Amino acid sequence: MKELSEVLQDWEAVIGLEIHTELTALDTKMFCNCKLSHDDEPNANVCPVCLGLPGALPVPNKRAIESIVKAGLATNCEIQRHSMFYRKHYFYPDMAKNFQTTQGPVAFAMYGHLDLDVTGRGAAERPDCAFGEAEAQSLESASANAEGLSTSMTSTMREGNQRAGHLASYDASNLQMPERRKDGSYTVPIRILRIHMEEDAAKMVHVGGAEGRITAAAESLVDYNRCGTPLIELVTEPDLRTPEEARLFMEKLRRIFVTLGISDCSMEKGSMRCDGNVSLRRRGETKLGTKTELKNLNSFKSLHDGLAYEICRQAEVLEEGGIIYQETRHWEPSRKRTVVMRVKETADDYRLFPDPD
């Protein structure tokens, strides 16, 4: 398998992140009054609401909604005046209700951006050929472009909301590449599609088998104390181009959330987790390739190394004439590889519809 630097000379990686953050500053769960603590005895902090028993009605946590508004303002998002909760159906043991309460097309915060400064070895990871003269622009123009998109798309979204009852996507084809400075550093605006509220799933412990991995465990135990924990999920547009950019974005977002006081953002404890979506395309092409989603990126190093491996793996498959399938893969840091977890679900598989409760 080729090295990452060699692969990125011929292939362009297209990366988007889904970052889940537990609102650890709160005392109770998202839709009930159960204590928010993962250190108690397993299944000690549960009730009919978080277990989805018949007749139990959820009540939104006001402080959780205030926290997501703070996060949206800090990331230059447009705060929506009207939003809805939806049911996202899937059948895994860590979700007792067989659906997750989340948000649909209209989230609490949408269409923001963060400017990402990339310097030193991180800047060197992105090849010079990614910055053609025809694409280059000044740092000030790049930032203004992102801000202009944020303003123009807000107007478009409002019009779409009146016409179709939901927010449509926006065209960002005019978002250009950044210009590399003399020292090799550059700044790139990373667009944020949405920040929405959802409840966390239960914690699963995989026992036995080789190194206790999910793929070889003898049995799995479920602790529902974490079920119903308020989460915010931030979804970026696929604007990241290297594993180092993804790592730096995650670090910057963590600093923002810690400063806001909405979460401790401890990746060791799992209060901040990241899923990476990555695809490849030949340099100069505009059509996106087939993406894979990476799980178990539970540290900054795992985020970088997992994405780097997957980029090299996809390049090897494509260069040998193979096909990349849309699937969810699990990063195994001990073996430094990704393995298939499941074929990726589509939106139809989730049967998303407004939560009547």
Where are these regions (language model features)?
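Low-complexity, intrinsically disordered segments with a bias for serine/threonine
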Residues: 142-147, 154-159, 173
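Surface-exposed charge patches in extracellular/virion surface proteins
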Residues: 2, 145, 149, 158, ...
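Low-complexity, intrinsically disordered tandem-repeat tracts enriched in small residues
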Residues: 130, 134-136, 142, 146-148
